[in-house]
Amino acid sequence: MGGGNCNPKDFGAAAYWDARYSSPSTGGKGGGGGGFFDWYRSYSALRPLLRACVPTSSQVLMLGCGNSLLSEDMVKDGYQNIVNIDISSVVIEQMKEKHTDIAQLTYMQLDVRDMSFFGDGSFDCIIDKGTLDAMMCGDDAPHGAYKMLAEVARLMRPGGIYMLITYGAPKERLTLLNQVRCHWEVELYIMPATPEYQLKWSNGAAHAMMEKVALTVDGQLPPDYVLKDPESHFIYVCYKSDIVTEDKSMVAGQDDAMSSF
């Protein structure tokens, strides 16, 4: 995540994000409310994978939407129903105002650790571009991250997709994803972030900007795999093949299980 001088421990708190989105530099007071910012990758970079995995008729949930252009760009490309949530009431009001004429977009202030407003199996696709990473910087990490993922699993319809765009390598993120008792089938794609590596990968190949990587049986990168760009972004496409097995005792046990993060 972009750090600047901010304390990463603030990333799980509404107060931090409210202050951030009230700043003129992010389109808040004094800035005309017109600012947009995309963590990691833009829609144009993600479009091939999104269009391949997510039909335009899907019911989509955007986690931690912030003031990203991703949802707007998806609607321009034919997506019909995107619910955007964020812990910051400030940015939600900003985005409601900006997109008041776009009927395909809905905005709600909601904490991803408790999305009980929505019923089980409400969404075909849930997109997370940096939100899990922010949760792992919160005061209640990794417990808060687990609660978020449990909610994601609950909200997904069988056959649905959770698309996680993150800086987290498989050793960290797949271990975290596997704590959820949902039958995930995970595909991993790696996108170089540094321009020099993007150019090296091009060579006219259709997959130049996104490489699908076969994971080992235990869900890790192959031992001989060489990560070309150390600043790469990882995209985990998690398919839900069955209904989550509810076990409330898991929540209390996750802190010990994930204490290595």
Range-by-range predicted roles:
Residues P142-P158:
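A short glycine-rich, Lys/Arg-flanked "PGG" loop and its adjoining helix->strand segment in the class I
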Residues P158-T166:
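Conserved beta-strand signature within the Rossmann-like core of class I S-adenosyl-L-methionine
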Residues F36-S58, L69, D73:
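Conserved alpha-helix/loop element of class I SAM-dependent methyltransferases that forms part
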Residues Y146-A150, P170-A214:
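Conserved Class I S-adenosyl-L-methionine
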Residues Q59-M115, A150:
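Class I SAM-dependent methyltransferase SAM/SAH-binding core
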Residues K200-F261:
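Core SAM-dependent methyltransferase catalytic element
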Residues R113-I126:
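A short acidic, Gly/Pro-enriched loop at the edge of an enzyme's catalytic core
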Residues N7-D10, T26-R47:
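Conserved SAM-binding loop and adjacent beta-strand
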